[in-house]
Amino acid sequence: MADSGIEQAFSSALLPTGTRIACRIEYDGSGYHGWQAQLKSSSPTVQGALEHALERVAVQPIRVHCAGRTDAGVHGHAQIVHFDAPCTCSAKAWVLGGNSHLPPDVRIHWAQPVPEDFHARFSALARRYRYVIVNSAIRPALSSRQLTWQRKPLDAVRMHGAAQALLGEQDFSAFRA
């Protein structure tokens, strides 16, 4: 039996103009100046790359909204985005067509119609962040963009204690830009 997520990601059923589409994307943010497109800058952003690719599929402008903006160099593993389809198109066309116009460090994993009141940012139930610290004498060569390296010994007990304050549901609104 086929996985329903795969079936939906590649559904050939046409979705009418105006349908709100949600997508799961992933990206290596190393080469980008964050998520958000900058009006007066030619610096590459993930939003800019994604909108450009989807606009090539639709042959019309598209504005993409995300669950959470990331800073320069930050990666996204399961970022949910949405847009209102400016044309009749299938989920398969959004995924495969979008990916054909994206650079290799940005990918659309699935696309599906969602209710018109869905919003990637405000409908999110949770967000998860992962930080990887490698503590070794030698800096790793593989996956070096997805981690931070520390040569000197770390105090794991103190780090664990400090991290407890971050667990659970928190209000980090004071840290917003």
Question: What are these regions, as identified by a protein language model?
Answer:
Residues A2-A177:
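Structured-RNA-binding interfaces characteristic of tRNA pseudouridine synthases
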